[in-house]
Amino acid sequence: MKKFVFPLVFGLTLSGYAVYSVLDALIIPSGESYTVEDDDDNSFFGNNNGPKEENDLNNNQNQENPNPGNNENPEKEEPEEIITSHPDYLRYYKSDDLEVKIYKETVKTKDTFNNVMADTNIFCADVRVSDLSHFRGRFAIIDGKPTYGYHRYSTTSSIAKNGNAIFAISGDNYAGREKGYVVRNGKTYRDSVSNSEDLVVWGDGSFGTFKEKNTPLSEITSNPLGAWQVFSFGPALVVNDQIMVDDKTEITTGIAKNNGNQRSVIGIIEPLHYFITISEARLEDSFGQSLYEAAEFIKSKGVKTAYNLDGGGSATIWFDGEVLNRPKDNNTPGIGEREIGDAILFK
């Protein structure tokens, strides 16, 4: 009898482990935290907007080559060419899916305190993407729920590096406000109404603007185009080629009322072709822009719609591991990045 005991025990143990493995995969909840984003999740995209799935590519290959085993010399796929420098630009990157051209201009802006014209440095980024999967919003928080009172701050640099970005700018300061719509990468994270005028990045890569007080978020997210991003800060600076602010317009919070400040502005030339400006301020050699000056400048670059993001000491432009501008916070001595709640990534 004893000689049958070991095989019996071993068989029961093996069977038990197999049952547990199935339960663990399908039923037993894990202890992992909820992750607020998935950079590889392209479920938002329809057949025409997103990158092709691997299965689709395989199916196409099988249709074109019904007898792959008969090919003695199959063609090798050419490696993607990536260009990382250009003589005409401060920074440059070009791949099949992303092109970023960065340069700096120095312009004259008005110092209304002293009634003189002063120099202001503006970093400009001309960005093209092949589809919206390369235009990402990313929170500083990794685990948990990204709402007011439960968030984590980090620098634009850290957020960009963690998101494997090539180019990034600071976001809309969602974490610093209790209300305001938040949609990132096709997912809704907050739908409480604020007084903000918002920017929506539609699923075809175009821009739209709307006021939260007049527009339920459900109306935006149910649009047939789909809402890929919704940023809540504002105001809109340019809409349909028209400047929407004047020299008296200013955000309701902030110290630079009607005067020069660091500005972060994102605009669109055409779907999937964007233009971004980050101006420096609070520096001896760079005074800053009013909202009207920021609108005039970016409109001169051919944008059709432009939107004001969180500026001031938060305004940061980052490229391939390097902060290009000199962020300056009035509450902190010296130059350095302010920790923020979110960033906009191109990858």
Task: Show the residue positions of the predicted features.
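Short, glycine-/Ser/Thr-/acidic-enriched flexible segments
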Residues: S130-L132, Y174, N214, M244, ...
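Short, solvent-exposed aromatic-acidic interface loops
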Residues: F139-P146, N214-L217, S279-L283
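Active-site-adjacent helix-turn-beta-strand microarchitecture at beta-sheet edges
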Residues: S170-A256
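Short acidic-glycine loop/turn motifs at beta-strand connectors
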Residues: R128-D131, V201-F207, K211, V239-N240, ...
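Conserved, well-ordered active-site substructure
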Residues: E178-V201, K248-K304, L309, S314-K347
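Loop/turn elements at helix/coil->beta-strand transitions in domains of secreted/extracellular proteins
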Residues: G163-I166, S206, Q242, P271-Y274, ...
